[in-house]
């Protein structure tokens, strides 16, 4: 909701997003803020049931969540900030169960950031023409000349983080065997078939990351 409020004027100028509730005026900014405050209250009530370390770390995610929508105005790396924010739950889940932070969740978290960086770059290519006109920045624009190399790099870092996590957790060979499935999917299906000039193809491949 915060993202839609922040991007209201931008969304009006982009064909794909102009019908979003706040951009189209179906929901007012005031009502959007009420929804946001309500959701934050419920989230806080849930959070207070966890240990102190989890609560402190969770509160640290708030500045990330509220500053992310502004990043596309100032940097070509808003997708990186999305990854940092979106995957924060990996850290929280570990701390909630173990009551401390460790190397393993940090490695997994770092890898997941690059996964998000990759698939949201694909997502961004849907609007790249409109974004360039209105002045929005993104990794899609920054790497538009050779996006596949960038995506391969992001996904390689992600898969490497999973392998490293498996080694540190002493997983058996089945983990690495099943890891071939997402590896094949990311490299041979997503990146290989990615057509950054076709918005429908971009959205189709982006959605494949829900596996």
Residue ranges and their predicted role:
Residues 2, 6, 117-136:
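Membrane-embedded alpha-helices of multi-pass transport/permease systems
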Residues 3, 61, 65-69, 111-116, ...:
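Alpha-helical transmembrane segments of multi-pass membrane proteins
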């Amino acid at each position: 909701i915060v993202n839609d409020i922040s991007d209201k004027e931008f969304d009006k100028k982009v064909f794909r997003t102009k019908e979003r509730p706040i951009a189209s005026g179906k929901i007012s900014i005031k009502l959007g803020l009420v929804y946001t405050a309500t959701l934050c209250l419920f989230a806080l009530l849930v959070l207070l049931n966890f240990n102190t370390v989890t609560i402190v770390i969770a509160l640290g995610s708030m500045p990330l969540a509220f500053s992310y929508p502004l990043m596309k105005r100032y940097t070509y790396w808003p997708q990186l900030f999305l990854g940092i924010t979106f995957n924060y739950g990996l850290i929280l889940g570990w701390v909630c169960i173990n009551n401390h932070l460790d190397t393993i969740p940090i490695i997994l978290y770092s890898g997941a950031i690059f996964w998000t960086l990759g698939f949201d770059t694909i997502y961004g290519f849907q609007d790249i023409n409109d974004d360039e006109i209105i002045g929005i920045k993104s990794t899609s624009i920054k790497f538009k000349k050779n996006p596949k190399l960038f995506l391969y790099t992001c996904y390689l870092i992600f898969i490497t983080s999973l392998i490293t996590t498996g080694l540190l957790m002493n997983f058996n060979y089945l983990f690495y065997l099943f890891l071939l499935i997402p590896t094949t999917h990311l490299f041979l299906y997503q990146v290989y078939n990615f057509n950054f000039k076709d918005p429908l193809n971009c959205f189709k491949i982006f959605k494949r990351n829900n596996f």
